[in-house]
From Swiss-Prot:
GO MF annotation list: NADP binding; shikimate 3-dehydrogenase (NADP+) activity
UniProt EC number: 1.1.1.25
Protein name per UniProt: Shikimate dehydrogenase (NADP(+))
Pathway: Metabolic intermediate biosynthesis; chorismate biosynthesis; chorismate from D-erythrose 4-phosphate and phosphoenolpyruvate: step 4/7
Enzyme class: oxidoreductase
Residues reported to bind NADP(+): 84, 132-136, 156-161, 226, 250
Keywords linked to the UniProt accession: Amino-acid biosynthesis, Aromatic amino acid biosynthesis, NADP, Oxidoreductase
Organism: Bordetella bronchiseptica (strain ATCC BAA-588 / NCTC 13252 / RB50) (Alcaligenes bronchisepticus)
PANTHER family reported in the protein's UniProt record: BIFUNCTIONAL 3-DEHYDROQUINATE DEHYDRATASE_SHIKIMATE DEHYDROGENASE, CHLOROPLASTIC, SHIKIMATE DEHYDROGENASE
Function as written in the Swiss-Prot or TrEMBL entry: Involved in the biosynthesis of the chorismate, which leads to the biosynthesis of aromatic amino acids. Catalyzes the reversible NADPH linked reduction of 3-dehydroshikimate (DHSA) to yield shikimate (SA).
SUPFAM superfamilies reported in the protein's UniProt record: Aminoacid dehydrogenase-like, N-terminal domain, NAD(P)-binding Rossmann-fold domains
Reactions performed catalytically: shikimate + NADP(+) = 3-dehydroshikimate + NADPH + H(+)
Length: 287
């Protein structure tokens, strides 16, 4: 009698990790596509990323989503086998075991772009304000440029960090036709307003908004916060008061980046819509 094969094993690794919705998301993708899998949370010691990954691989693991604080270590692990998106992002959030080695990709920016498109944003020719100059901001520059944005203006509380990110992007990125500039938060204004403003800071964790000037938004503009919750974030409330026509949080980005990881691992692209609806319903019920 032949025993049934165990489903392929995947996980999300981070510290902390108990809050992660990735197992729930990938279970729904599995049911939707008919691709069996085992997906779990891996809590790694802050100084124990590599041993945890090695033990996971030795137990048959084939893929990892990587979250805080390990995206840079994942980049180093897969440095010889990086996708272009990961190279330009400077961080890896998706590891795949292929041909005897770990390969690294970054799906955060694709998740953002796909969610913006789902929301009806015309990114081709768009003027985008990107608030924040950390890893979250860096990770979305290439997909935004590839989507045809005309201009991306990076602003940060420390203006020098925004300038460094813009300079690093211009030095490393292929020619895209996207103008990338930088400044302080107080230099966020644009004549005619921005078509899209994206908050890539963690200000929402303190229920605070970046200290931005008023008058930022063009008619029909969208304000997008990478953070999410049951209620509008402080950035969303600030944007609405400043005249943004629409506001959205980052739950769709979360589901979108997971869908891209699923596609990398399994070769099939799930529909994020039903999963996003289920998570949103759950959030609202809990909030």
């Amino acid at each position: 009698m032949t025993l049934p094969a165990s489903p392929p094993r995947y996980a999300v690794i981070g510290n902390p990790i108990a809050h992660s919705r990735s197992p729930q998301i990938h279970a729904m993708f599995s049911a939707q596509t008919g691709r069996p899998l085992r997906y779990e949370r891996l809590l790694a010691p802050v100084d124990g990323f590599l041993p945890t990954v090695q033990a996971f691989r030795e137990s048959g693991g084939l893929g990892l989503n990587v979250t805080v604080p390990f995206k840079l270590e994942a980049y180093a692990l897969a440095e010889a086998r990086l996708s272009e998106r990961a190279r330009l992002a400077g961080a890896v959030n998706t590891l795949s075991w292929r041909d005897g080695a770990w390969h690294g990709c970054n799906t955060d920016g694709v998740g953002l772009v796909n969610d913006l498109l789902r929301l009806g944003v015309a990114l081709a020719g768009a003027r985008v304000l990107l608030v924040g100059a950390g890893g979250a901001a860096r990770g979305v520059l290439q997909p935004l440029a590839a989507a045809g944005c005309a201009r991306i203006h990076i602003v940060n509380r420390t203006a020098a960090r925004a300038a460094e990110l813009a300079a690093a992007w211009r030095a490393a990125a292929p020619r895209t036709g996207t103008q990338v500039s930088a400044g302080a938060l107080a230099q966020a204004a644009e004549p005619g307003g921005w078509d899209v403003a994206i908050n890539a800071t963690a200000s929402g964790l303190q229920d605070a908004a970046p200290d931005l000037p008023g008058g930022l938004y063009a008619p029909d503009a969208l304000a997008y916060d990478m953070m999410y919750g049951a209620r509008p974030t402080a950035f969303m409330r600030q944007a609405e008061a400043d005249g943004a026509a629409r506001c959205a949080d980052g739950l769709g980005m979360l589901v979108g980046q997971a869908a891209e990881s699923f596609h990398i691992w399994h070769g099939v692209r799930p529909d994020p819509g039903p999963v996003l609806l289920a998570l949103r319903t759950e959030l609202l019920a809990a909030g």
